[in-house]
Structures are given as structure tokens and as C-alpha cells.
């Protein structure tokens, strides 16, 4: 790796999580000679009460739409043009909804220098003709750069409020993982680096499906014992899925990192997927309607990931091996009754 400092950082995305990460990076780079002191952040331009969102961020230093109430450091510069934002960047932090990754990579392919490094904070997967494709694989293929991943029990508003949490960086090149740890770690944002990157990334995507099931249980007022069963059986399906679909060997220890069981717990109790799934049961409205009503422009990942997982499992004739993942998809998209989530627990293969 021939990166010469100070390294220029660009954050590709500026939603709730992207803005929280921008706050960390903006503060950290001020005190480190290794990194350039200005941080570019690509912002999908929106109009907020007659003003451009980039203008608000650059003058008031707050993302009033996606992270209100938290000041961003003044060295974080919002740019509406993606190509301008990534120009000359050495380190790219990808933090956008997973459904936009193809479009973003196509736009900046060939515009980033060959020694640049990426890290994806995107929780989701893609499916192609060969089945599973990880978001990091898409970035790697389209951008021709090395990509690490960061996943963990990180509810963005709590991270922005500097409440203590942990996270996991997965990097097949340990030195690249350690470089991103240096950029991102703070006393209240503690990072472990592991080499089992594909498992780290899969955990971040699959836990959102389990959180939807947890939200269904909350909507049905099932109680904490049932939710604990959803979390445990969901974790078992996550492990089984990783064992089938990961190209490299899977370490069970990775599921004990923040990206695994910790992220699963926090998402099943505090995340947006759980919240919307509970409302789905109580209101009878569609997932799409609730996303528009409840999330202030943010995207829901769990239902869409369940659909992608379902199609991947169909290709392998393995739908019946993953009853919880399947039930979430069928309830969200095929009109199956929400109570099916309970019957899938009752007859789960783990009990047979």
C-alpha cells in the first residue's frame, strides 16, 4: 500500500448514521497528522424549507434533517456533487442505503486513485445470477479498491450523543482494518478488528430480518421470552446462512463480537426495523406506507433484505431450512398472517 499522508477522507453518504460517523471523523482528524484536516461528505441534495441541505450543513454545521440536535465539526464539508466529493480521496467511507450502491459506484468508477481504500458501513446484501453478493464485493469489483467493513451495535443517535458503544471492523488485510480503526476509534466508540470480514458484513445485513420478526412479536404483545427466542433462533439462522454462503471459512467467534450478538440485541430492542414491524401489526398499513410516515426519509433495510435472502434461498432450494427468514418475507410481501411468525418458532428445526 503506497498511501502517503496526510490521507484525505471522503464520507459517501450523509443520513443518520453517515452524519454520526462524520462527527467522529471530523473531531478525530483534527488531532492526527496522518489524516487531512478537512473531511468531504457527499450529501444527496434536498430542499429543507426553501434552503439547500448542503448550505445548512456548511453554515450551521448540523444535518437538520437526518441528525438534528447534534453539531458537526466545522471541518466536515458537505458537497452535493459526488465526483467532486471523492476527488483525490485516499479513504472512502460508504454509508448509504444498500439499494443505491450500484448507482453510486458507477458514477465514481475510475474517478478514485488506485491506491485508495474503502470501508462500507452499509447493512444489506445484493443478489445476482450466482446468488449472494456482498456490498463490499460490489464496491471492490466496480471501484477496483480494497474494501473493509464496519458493523456493530451502533444506533446512530446514541453514537452521536457520545454514549459508550463497541463496533467491529472486518478486514481481510489487517493493516487496512487497523488504519480505519485509527481514523474512527474514540474513548466511547471502541473498535475490534477481525479478519473474518464476510461474516461481519453478513451479520450486519441479516440481523435486520430478525429485528422485523422481533417487531412482529412486539406488535402481537408476545412478551420478552418470545422475543428472546426470536433472537436466539434468528442468530442460529444467521450462523447457518453464513456457513452456506460465505466463500471463506466462518469463525463462530465473530458472532460474539459487536457485529454479531450485540448488534442483534440492540436492533431487536431499539432499531427502526423493529419499530416499523410493530406498527405494521398494530395499524394494518403496508411496509411502504409506514416507511414514508415514520422514518423521515430514511430507508428500511430489513424487509428488502428478507426478499433478497428469500430469492437466494430459492436458488439453492433451501427455503425450508430458514423458517424465520422466510416467515418475515412472506408476512411482509405475500400477505401471510403475522401470527405465522409464532408458528414458525413453534416448529423450528432447532427443536426437532
Curated annotation (Swiss-Prot):
GO BP annotations, alphabetical order: carbohydrate metabolic process; glycerol-3-phosphate catabolic process
Keyword line: Cytoplasm, NAD, Oxidoreductase
Pfam families, alphabetized: NAD_Gly3P_dh_C, NAD_Gly3P_dh_N
Binding site residues for NAD(+): 13-18, 156, 272, 299, 301
Protein purpose: Plays a role in regulating cardiac sodium current.
PANTHER family: GLYCEROL-3-PHOSPHATE DEHYDROGENASE, GLYCEROL-3-PHOSPHATE DEHYDROGENASE 1-LIKE PROTEIN
Protein name, UniProt field: Glycerol-3-phosphate dehydrogenase 1-like protein
Gene that this polypeptide is encoded by: gpd1l
